[in-house]
Regions:
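Conserved, well-structured core domains of diverse proteins
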Residues: 1-176
Length: 176
């Protein structure tokens, strides 16, 4: 009964979602063989741009790992990216992560609060590199490690105030 009340809430509030219904005709179903495979669809998935300083090393890296595993793209945000996440991979021409590796083993214990086990072949590299007006963390090497560049022209969330982190979030690691 509770689930029904919650599920009908959109209809009662007259939201667009609540007024939308699918009319299915099994006779007009598209054969599964004509549907684009999920492995192709996820290649167009991308995370939002969130800087390393705005979240955590673990969260920022986990987004990159997850998107790389499915074939999508993560975005560095305007704070740049730790060169340890892409330098070795670029030099080797592919992932250098081996079985038994951990996040702190790659980045260093002083840069990780909660260690994360990695899989062989994982990539910590964000494929989308954002460049903002202050160019935090932007180097030639950083730009060369991108599959895609995103040039930020304006601040949407806090117009006129972008790129300012609360003081307690600016650690030595973030300041680098």
């Amino acid at each position: 009964e509770y689930a029904q009340i919650i599920n009908d809430q959109s209809k009662r509030h007259m939201t667009l979602r609540g007024l939308f219904e699918f009319k299915l005709d099994p006779a007009q179903a598209i054969p599964l063989s004509e549907v684009e495979p999920a492995t192709n669809i996820v290649k167009r998935f991308a995370t939002g741009a969130m800087s390393l300083g705005s979240i955590s090393t673990e969260a920022h890296t986990t987004l990159a790992i997850a998107m790389n595993r499915i074939g999508g793209k993560s975005n560095t945000g305007e704070g740049g990216e730790d060169p340890m996440r892409y330098r070795q991979e670029l030099r080797a021409g592919g992932s250098v992560i081996e079985t038994g590796a951990t996040l702190s083993g790659v980045l260093g214990r002083d840069r990780v609060e909660v260690d994360t086990p990695l899989r062989a072949g994982d990539s910590l590299r964000s494929k989308i590199k954002q460049v903002a007006s202050a160019r935090f963390g932007v180097t030639t090497e950083y730009l060369n490690s991108a599959d895609q560049l995103q040039i930020k022209m304006a601040q949407g969330a806090k117009p006129g105030e972008g790129g300012q982190l609360p003081g307690h979030k600016v650690s030595t690691y973030i300041a680098e």
